[in-house]
């Protein structure tokens, strides 16, 4: 084997290793995306939904998505 062939094989092995490790990272990034989505509406978990029998706390109102939000900001 000449030097160029060794370099090509080394690059292929490195690409294979990167592909395998990035696939493992993708599954954990899905979990992170789910956590980020949960973090977008922090009041919904804390105050709950507006669906009966649960009601919003007095200083909040129910929006169209049935989530308790601040009346002025809608968040």
Curated annotation (Swiss-Prot):
KW Signal (keyword) present: yes
Principal place of residence: secreted
UniProtKB keywords: Disulfide bond, Secreted, Signal, Toxin
Signal peptide, first to last residue: 1-19
Tissue: Expressed by the venom gland.
Subcellular location: Secreted
Covalent S-S links between cysteines: 50-62, 56-68
Domain of life: Eukaryota
GO cellular component terms, A-Z: extracellular region
Annotated GO MF terms: toxin activity
Record function comment: Insecticidal toxin.
Protein name per its UniProtKB record: Insecticidal toxin OcyC10
Organism whose genome encodes this protein: Opisthacanthus cayaporum (South American scorpion)
């Amino acid at each position: 084997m000449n030097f160029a062939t060794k370099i090509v094989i080394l690059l292929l092995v490195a690409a294979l290793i990167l592909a395998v490790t990035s696939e493992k990272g993708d599954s954990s990034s899905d979990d992170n995306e789910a956590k980020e989505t949960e973090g977008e509406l922090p009041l919904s978990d804390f105050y709950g939904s507006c669906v009966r029998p649960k009601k919003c706390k007095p200083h909040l109102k129910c929006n169209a998505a049935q989530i308790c939000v601040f009346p002025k900001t809608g968040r």
